[in-house]
Amino acid sequence: MTTPPGYLLDTNILSDLIRHPQGTVASKIEAAGEQSVCTSIIVAAELRYGAHKSGSRKLADRIDLILSALEILPLEAPADRHYGEIRHHLAREGNPIGPNDMLIAAHALSAGLTVVMTANIGKFSRVPGLSVENWLAE
């Protein structure tokens, strides 16, 4: 029986892994266990957009390689409920985050995962109940 994933890797963490395949993120994945990490279809879409925007075939190939090695979770219910709650809460607080970040947070909450990122800790930490880690801050 395989261990269910515990960590959802965000776009900036996977971007760092693409830039530094033997770097800190790779070491953290190895320490956590490859079966304990996954990503969201939202993150995969953001990475693919970045590859198309750059026009770099080399970058697209690296993204293909990274994504082929990861479990990519489809966005399913009850993520929609979490999204509605998150968006309402952040709007009421007057402190919204981007739509893709809200979807990623909702996806992680619905799957019971910790979101791993770098620069976005501040905005993701405003989402009630969401566990976040910065694997590059240590």
What do the predicted segments below correspond to?
Residues 1-5, 61, 71-116:
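Active-site neighborhoods of divalent-metal-dependent phosphate/nucleic-acid chemistry enzymes
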Residues 1-39, 49-67, 138:
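Short, well-structured N-terminal submotif of metal-dependent ribonuclease cores
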Residues 10-11, 25, 47, 83, ...:
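Generic structural signal for small/hydrophobic residues in well-ordered secondary structure
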Residues 6, 105-138:
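Acidic, metal-binding active-site segment of PIN/NYN-like and related structure-specific nucleases
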Residues 14-15, 45-48, 73, 125, ...:
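Nucleotide phosphate-binding site architecture
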Residues 12-13, 42-45, 78, 122:
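Alpha-helix/helix-capping structural signal
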Residues 28, 69, 82, 123-126:
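Residue-level recognition of specific faces of alpha-helices
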Residues 20-21, 50-54, 86, 93, ...:
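Residue-level signal for well-ordered alpha-helical positions
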